[in-house]
């Protein structure tokens, strides 16, 4: 895949609305053209020990951060026309839908692709697991700061460039032959059985 935006959310607690950071890597023409990292004030605004142990963020880190709507207003125009790619996309898509609903925002129905699901199809049992760092290593990318949203998004982008094919282009509808009459077109739509019963 050559044109997409890789995305990764980290959350402050077990609620999918509690996104506390987002990393986005925009790829066009097979090249990374933009990287975005933002802290977000989570909702609900509290951290659990186990989430902090995963990504290292605390209440103090996001105390003065913007709420999701302000952050997304900056990001949304950059994603126009691009599919989104995530590793374990049901989680990130679930977070994105949840915060849109929480803040009464219209969800744009982003098209998501999943590098984890694709890895299972491409590599299968050749890998011990299909976690992000494992797949990244298999694709020749060294993920040094796992669970930092931007680092994870960049790893996801590098994987997607290698293993997710470009989506098929929609077929163009054939134009009717210039010599075809309207009556002939309607006749072609009449089921054969109906014609026989006339």
Placement of each model-derived feature along the sequence:
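Amphipathic alpha-helical interaction segments
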Residues: 94-95, 155-158
């Amino acid at each position: 895949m050559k044109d997409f935006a890789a995305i990764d959310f980290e959350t402050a607690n077990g609620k999918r609305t509690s996104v506390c950071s987002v990393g986005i890597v925009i790829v066009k023409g097979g090249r990374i053209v933009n990287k975005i990292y933002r802290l977000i004030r989570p909702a609900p605004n509290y951290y659990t020990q186990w989430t902090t142990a995963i990504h290292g963020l605390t209440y103090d880190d996001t105390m003065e951060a913007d709420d999701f709507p302000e952050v997304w207003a900056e990001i949304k125009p950059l994603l126009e026309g691009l599919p989104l790619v995530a590793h374990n996309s049901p989680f990130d898509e679930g977070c994105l839908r949840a915060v849109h609903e929480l803040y009464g925002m219209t969800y744009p129905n982003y098209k998501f692709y999943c590098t984890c699901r694709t890895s299972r199809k491409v590599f299968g049992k050749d890998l011990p697991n299909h976690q992000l760092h494992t797949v990244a290593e298999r694709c020749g990318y060294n993920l040094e700061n796992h669970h930092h949203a931007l680092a994870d998004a960049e790893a996801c982008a590098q994987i997607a460039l290698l293993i997710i094919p470009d989506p098929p282009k929609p077929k163009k509808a054939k134009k009717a032959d210039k010599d075809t009459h309207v009556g002939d077109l309607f006749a072609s739509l009449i089921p054969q059985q109906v014609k026989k019963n006339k």
